[in-house]
UniProtKB/Swiss-Prot annotation:
Protein's name according to its UniProt entry: Small ribosomal subunit protein uS7
Gene3D superfamilies registered for this protein in UniProt: Ribosomal protein S7 domain (1.10.455.10)
One of the GO BP terms on file: translation
UniProt KW keywords: Ribonucleoprotein, Ribosomal protein, RNA-binding, rRNA-binding, tRNA-binding
Database matches in NCBIfam families: rpsG_bact
CC terms in the record's Gene Ontology section: small ribosomal subunit
Family according to the record: Belongs to the universal ribosomal protein uS7 family.
Pfam families in UniProt: Ribosomal_S7 (PF00177)
InterPro entries in UniProt: Ribosomal_uS7, Ribosomal_uS7_bac/org-type, Ribosomal_uS7_CS, Ribosomal_uS7_dom, Ribosomal_uS7_dom_sf
Amino acid sequence: MSRRNRAPKRDILPDPKYKSQVVAKFVNHIMLSGKKSIAEKIVYGAFDKIKAKDASANEVEVFEKALESVSPMVEVKSRRVGGATYQVPVEVRPERRQTLGMRWIIDAARKRKENTMGDRLAAEILEAVEGRGAAVKKREDTHKMAEANKAFAHFRW
């Protein structure tokens, strides 16, 4: 284990278009190999497609609603007791909830069949809002796993 202090959390500057830290963090998650301008084009393009589908909706609010419907409340962590390894259900911290939600939306979007990443992302976000899609299924599977291992909750540390 490291003897150094934990690195301090860095503040994320809000993104230039929507002035939202959540969107800025999402852009950073989309980004590959430091290509932020491309990541911004993808995210903003997806948001434009969401806006085109429903003109009355605010795209950032739609995204935050999707993120909320995908973010897990509980997850399982492996805990070794004696010779056995148990899957112990633990509550997810708010920051990790957000990060996992973003990661799952992106992973699900990358596996979709649409032509561009912007199309895939928009479709996945819209499905997440409706409670469908691969990212929502991932959350349900995680919750089922935690529910199935509820008996080991007393191994929490």
